[in-house]
């Protein structure tokens, strides 16, 4: 299960580590930039934030509303524009005489931002569902292992549960749109996902969501 959580954040580990380093690097304005980008990325959804930081308030996350994320085209477009804005800001630092460590961080961020922005024309190539790493497989595990360190975490968890119907409704709408473009899941993957969902619905006293 620990490996599953690592796979969920496959795009973020190295990026986040380097951004964290940016908070103590010698160029103060670049440190401010990386800290802002760090917060922007973690603010995408509450579960990512909760699993990454044990004390979010120490990084400027205060009074945030619980969110599983937004799986709509409007949200996708906004994120692409935000990333473009971040890359424009980053160009100012790439042209400066940064320290070796700052320069390496800036180059990595530029590479990552470019890759994310290039997805702009490939919205329907996204696939939130999958037999192993799909949302329907990952989310129950993440919720089962959600850490409760303080009372506020309980409220946060309950707020996340309330959002599940709307979140999955967005994913269903997205899959319908993909199907209309002839890009729906292949039959084998679909059968595995449906079998997995049906198994989740077979609840007894040994179900991992209960025993955990």
Task: Walk through the language-model features, giving the residues of each.
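N-terminal maturation segment of proteins
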Residues: 7-212
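Positively charged n-region of N-terminal signal peptides that target proteins for export
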Residues: 1-6
